[in-house]
């Protein structure tokens, strides 16, 4: 699993700095879509949605789906269950999906698209304070698609490089352990 390959504190620090630099909310999840890092820079809108059990369930399922949407093992941009734009970069070790770096919680600048209307449609079955929800939604940043695509590529490169280093360190430790065990066996 991811936490056995890489120091989670290092991933947390990278995630925090990425989020600070880009302004995007971010979290790293395991193979089941469950966070292994603390969320960074989550919007008030998303934090509010996640305070409701059904909201948290949908967000977790969406995070899981987002990470797995990457059939070609490349980053992907998608719309979450609340209508916001998210991105997912798969973390892959030896051709196996072990988690994802997720970011976003923004709106894409699009003509002829009423994002707020879409959000209310997506969340119609939630028993929430609609006025408060609307206020929080108005605080969500609108960004150009180019910025989201660049962020997706960046987190894909960063996270997979770090995981490859971690996997290499694990292989080296295993080899050292095997050499030591063989030497101990021969010495006895």
In which residue ranges do the predicted regions lie?
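Short intrinsically disordered, low-complexity coil segments enriched in acidic
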Residues: 1-2, 188
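Polar/charged, Q/E/K-enriched amphipathic alpha-helical segments with strong coiled-coil propensity
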Residues: 113-117, 123, 127-145
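Structured interaction and signal-relay segments at domain junctions
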Residues: 2-83
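Signal-transducing coiled-coil/dimerization helices and immediately adjacent hinge/linker segments
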Residues: 135-188
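Sensory/regulatory domains in signal-transduction proteins
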Residues: 62-121, 146-150, 154, 161
């Amino acid at each position: 699993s991811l936490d056995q390959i890489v120091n989670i504190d290092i991933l947390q620090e990278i995630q925090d700095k990425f989020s600070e630099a880009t302004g995007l909310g971010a979290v790293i999840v395991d193979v089941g879509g469950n966070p292994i890092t603390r969320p960074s820079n989550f919007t008030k809108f998303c934090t509010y949605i996640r305070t409701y059990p059904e909201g948290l369930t949908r967000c977790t399922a969406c995070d899981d789906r987002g990470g797995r949407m990457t059939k070609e093992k490349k980053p992907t941009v998608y719309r979450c269950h609340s209508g916001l734009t998210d991105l997912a970069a798969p973390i892959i070790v030896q051709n196996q999906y072990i988690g994802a770096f997720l970011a976003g919680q923004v709106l894409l600048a699009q003509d002829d698209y009423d994002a707020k209307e879409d959000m209310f449609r997506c969340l119609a079955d939630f028993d929430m304070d609609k006025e408060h929800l609307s206020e929080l939604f108005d605080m969500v940043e609108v960004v150009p698609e180019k910025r989201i695509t660049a962020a997706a590529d960046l987190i894909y490169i960063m996270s997979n490089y770090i995981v490859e280093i971690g996997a290499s360190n694990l292989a080296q430790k295993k080899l050292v352990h095997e050499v030591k065990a063989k030497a101990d066996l021969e010495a006895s």
